[in-house]
């Protein structure tokens, strides 16, 4: 029979594995913080743009009312 091929195995000390996991956890925590800040800034920018649009629409609506009511009551 042919020899069975096996996947090479490696055994690492537990201390090294714990150290690697702690480093990966720290990197993940930093990435979560950075992406949270990025999305928060993006949300603020979108909110500002929507507020500007609402302000313009309400301003135009008030101008139209002023013009229409001003002409009607002359």
Swiss-Prot record:
The keyword Mitochondrion does not apply. It is a single-pass membrane protein. It is an enzyme of class 7 (translocase). Pathway: One-carbon metabolism; methanogenesis from CO(2); methyl-coenzyme M from 5,10-methylene-5,6,7,8-tetrahydromethanopterin: step 2/2. GO terms for molecular function: tetrahydromethanopterin S-methyltransferase activity. Its main location: membrane. Keywords: Cell membrane, Membrane, Methanogenesis, Methyltransferase, One-carbon metabolism, Transferase, Translocase, Transmembrane, Transmembrane helix. It catalyses: 5-methyl-5,6,7,8-tetrahydromethanopterin + coenzyme M + 2 Na(+)(in) = 5,6,7,8-tetrahydromethanopterin + methyl-coenzyme M + 2 Na(+)(out). GO terms for cellular component: plasma membrane. GO terms for biological process: methanogenesis, from carbon dioxide; methylation; one-carbon metabolic process. Part of a complex that catalyzes the formation of methyl-coenzyme M and tetrahydromethanopterin from coenzyme M and methyl-tetrahydromethanopterin. This is an energy-conserving, sodium-ion translocating step. The complex is composed of 8 subunits; MtrA, MtrB, MtrC, MtrD, MtrE, MtrF, MtrG and MtrH. This is Tetrahydromethanopterin S-methyltransferase subunit G.
């Amino acid at each position: 029979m042919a020899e069975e091929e096996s996947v090479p195995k490696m055994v690492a000390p537990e201390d090294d594995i714990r150290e690697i996991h702690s480093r990966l956890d720290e990197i993940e925590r930093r990435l979560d913080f950075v992406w949270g800040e990025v999305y928060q800034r993006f949300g603020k920018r979108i909110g500002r743009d929507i507020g500007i649009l609402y302000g313009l629409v309400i301003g135009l609506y008030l101008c139209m009312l002023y013009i229409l009511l001003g002409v009607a009551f002359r």
